[in-house]
């Protein structure tokens, strides 16, 4: 039975090696070599007892759980320089013995939380040369305790899972070079006691936060685990924030300063420590005082200068820090936005700008004006609805005499969509901050507010509804009697007016004027072009047919033996045939409906004159004066 069993084992071993691969069985470990074989996927018949699997330089595009199922003894997996764009969740779930994973030179864009789950004993992870833009925070959680080498170089990373990297106590080498990292969190490497090489070359780091890790590279002999640190190729901003790094005195590095302008291009370690300075914040401009109506949006602005750029904060009237909430939002540029203001938002706000060199403050006053509704806003009672504005005015006039003997409010020059509101100056002794116009229409019961400066005594209402009835009231907003009182309002007068109905012709023109005018313009251009082409052909054909110019004979006499011939009678020059009469249309300038058509027609007529002036001639003469416009078309 022994010889047949041996043959069976040999046959099974030979069948386990994929056809394009080479299998080597060295000292009880099986190696499957499938590099440079043009594979489009992981061979399904790889021996599950394989210890080393090399699949580099192929065309594999995706990895999934079936590819490495039951390969519990696999130690080294090489997938370099393929076309891998996706790694399925738990694709390496059965590789509990894996020590080295090479995924460099692929096309990975992101790593999810489950992409690298499974290899709990992984020590070397190479992900360089991909297109990684995002790595999930928990992508490295399964091998935090065992990982020794992590290579994330030559990717598009702006952020890396710093919390996971900082929890790798056995990490020796960390390569983050040639990425887009612009900031390092403070203390990111504080727990990496075994780290011996950190490469941050060619990123976007302008500053580095102090970290005890960097001081280990200053004295290689005294440090138990000396650090090789590289951060050249970064746009370092050489100010007081990097003074701690300058004091490390690392003469073997070749870093240079990118800013400020006075230090740009200078060797980092040659700049004296005294030139690593900062500038305290300075409030350049800010909102000094802002008045808003209750319910409106309030935007407080504050801009500060300094080196480094100051951090902006706001303190509210209650001496509390204003943070982001459902009602307010503080932006990093110093803008504070309150979405819907209320009476409790009024008061003094303080803008604070801070940086390592100091701080600066500025005060902004916010006043919230309560919405007036026909009387003094300090009076208690329910707010009138939007449809009873005129009733509120009449009640105030009859009951308390709020409507004083001041010039009445008038609405004149009423059209279908506009009306001019005017009122008198009132009594000089009454201080007025501003005027408020309230109006609504029979088509829409919504009450509309308009704020007018105190220096104005007329206001043009626009965008009214044609053929609608309007009720309008004018109120004067005056300063309150005391600091705790609300704004006082005084009703000046009310008016009722109706807008003109919309003209049917205007609606028709609004619907069709653009298309009709463009059609006429395009047709005119085509007709003019055809006329030019026809005249050119006629002139060329006539010149080619005659060959030479005819001779003109005028008063010619021949000398013969006979008597002189009678002098030919001079014939008057033949008048040219009459030109065909052009059709002219005269626009007298109706501003209501024909304004847009007249402008388009005039523009087309001027273009026709400039391009085909030889055909159109002098055109038609209008009779309406200089203010009238003429549209001309060639028929």
From Swiss-Prot:
Gene that this sequence comes from: LRFN4
Chain span(s) of sequence motif PDZ-binding: 632-635
Ranges facing Extracellular side: 17-518
The protein's name in its UniProt record: Leucine-rich repeat and fibronectin type-III domain-containing protein 4
Phosphoserine PTM positions: 585, 626
Domain LRRNT positions: 17-48
A Pfam family reported for this protein in Swiss-Prot or TrEMBL: fn3
Gene3D superfamilies tied to this protein: Immunoglobulins, Ribonuclease Inhibitor
Domain notes: The PDZ-binding motif is required for neurite outgrowth promotion. This motif is also involved in DLG1-, DLG3- and DLG4-binding.
Posttranslational modification: Glycosylated.
Signal sequence, start to end: 1-16
Gene Ontology BP terms: regulation of postsynaptic density assembly; regulation of presynapse assembly; synaptic membrane adhesion
Membrane topology: Single-pass type I membrane protein
Residue ranges annotated as Cytoplasmic topological domain: 540-635
GO cellular component terms, semicolon-separated: cell surface; GABA-ergic synapse; glutamatergic synapse; plasma membrane; postsynaptic density membrane
Keyword Iron appears in the UniProt entry: no
InterPro entries linked to this entry: Cys-rich_flank_reg_C, FN3_dom, FN3_sf, Ig-like_dom, Ig-like_dom_sf, Ig-like_fold, Ig_I-set, Ig_sub
Entry function: Promotes neurite outgrowth in hippocampal neurons. May play a role in redistributing DLG4 to the cell periphery.
Domain LRRCT: 234-280
Glycosylated residues, chain numbering: 25, 70, 324, 333, 376, 440
């Amino acid at each position: 039975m022994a010889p047949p069993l041996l043959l069976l084992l040999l046959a099974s071993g030979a069948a386990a090696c994929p056809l394009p691969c080479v299998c080597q069985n060295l000292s009880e470990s099986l190696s499957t070599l499938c590099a440079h074989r043009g594979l489009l996927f992981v061979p399904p018949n790889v021996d599950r007892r394989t210890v080393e699997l090399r699949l580099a330089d192929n065309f594999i595009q995706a990895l999934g759980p079936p590819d490495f199922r039951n390969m519990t003894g696999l130690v080294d997996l090489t997938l370099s320089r393929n076309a891998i764009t996706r790694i399925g969740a738990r694709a390496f779930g059965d590789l509990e013995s894996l020590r080295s994973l090479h995924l460099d030179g692929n096309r990975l864009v992101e790593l999810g939380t489950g992409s690298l789950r499974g290899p709990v004993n992984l020590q070397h992870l190479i992900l360089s040369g991909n297109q990684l833009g995002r790595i999930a925070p928990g992508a490295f959680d399964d091998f935090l305790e065992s990982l020794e080498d992590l290579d994330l170089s030559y990717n598009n990373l702006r952020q890396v899972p710093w919390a996971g990297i900082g929890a790798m106590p056995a990490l020796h080498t960390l390569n983050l070079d040639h990425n887009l990292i612009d900031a390092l969190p403070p203390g990111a490497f504080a727990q990496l006691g075994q780290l011996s090489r950190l490469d941050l070359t060619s990123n976007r780091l302008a500053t580095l936060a102090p970290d005890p890790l960097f001081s280990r590279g200053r004295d290689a002999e005294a440090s138990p685990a000396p650090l090789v640190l590289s951060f050249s190729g970064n746009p370092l901003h050489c100010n007081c924030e990097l003074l701690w790094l300058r004091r490390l005195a690392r003469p073997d590095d070749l870093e240079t300063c990118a800013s400020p302008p006075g230090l740009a291009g200078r060797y980092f370690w040659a700049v004296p420590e005294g030139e690593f300075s900062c500038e305290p914040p300075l409030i350049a401009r800010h909102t000094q005082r802002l008045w808003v109506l209750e319910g409106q949006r309030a935007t407080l602005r504050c801009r500060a200068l300094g080196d480094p750029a100051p951090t902006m904060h706001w303190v509210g009237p209650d001496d509390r820090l204003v943070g982001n909430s459902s009602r307010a939002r503080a932006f990093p540029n110093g803008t504070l936005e309150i979405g819907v203001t209320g009476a409790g938002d009024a008061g003094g706000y303080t803008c604070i700008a801070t940086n390592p060199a100091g701080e600066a403050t500025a005060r902004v006053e916010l006043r919230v004006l309560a919405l007036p509704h026909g009387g003094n806003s300090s009076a208690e009672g329910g707010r009138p609805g939007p449809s009873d504005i005129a009733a509120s005015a009449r009640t105030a006039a009859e009951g308390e005499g709020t409507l004083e003997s001041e010039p009445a409010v008038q609405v004149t020059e009423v059209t279908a969509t506009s009306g001019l509101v005017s009122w008198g100056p009132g009594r000089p002794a009454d201080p007025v901050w501003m005027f408020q116009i309230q109006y609504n229409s029979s088509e829409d019961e919504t009450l509309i507010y308009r704020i007018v400066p105190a220096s104005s005594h007329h206001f043009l209402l626009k965008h009214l509804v044609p053929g609608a009835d309007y009720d309008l009231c004018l109120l004067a907003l005056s300063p309150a009697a005391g600091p705790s009182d609300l704004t006082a309002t005084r009703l000046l007068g009310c008016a009722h007016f109706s807008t003109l109905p919309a003209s049917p012709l205007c609606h028709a023109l609004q619907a069709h004027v653009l298309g009709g005018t463009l059609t006429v313009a395009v047709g005119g251009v085509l007709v003019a072009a055809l006329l030019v082409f026809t005249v050119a052909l006629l002139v060329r054909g006539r010149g080619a047919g005659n060959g030479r110019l005819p001779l003109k004979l005028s008063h010619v006499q021949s000398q013969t033996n006979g008597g002189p011939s009678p002098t030919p009678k001079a014939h008057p020059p033949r008048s040219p045939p009459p030109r065909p009469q052009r059709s002219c249309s005269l626009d007298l300038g109706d501003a209501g409906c024909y304004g847009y058509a007249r402008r388009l027609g005039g523009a087309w007529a001027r273009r026709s004159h400039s391009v085909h002036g030889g055909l159109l001639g002098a055109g038609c003469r209008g009779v309406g004066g200089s203010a009238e416009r003429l549209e001309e078309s060639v028929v």
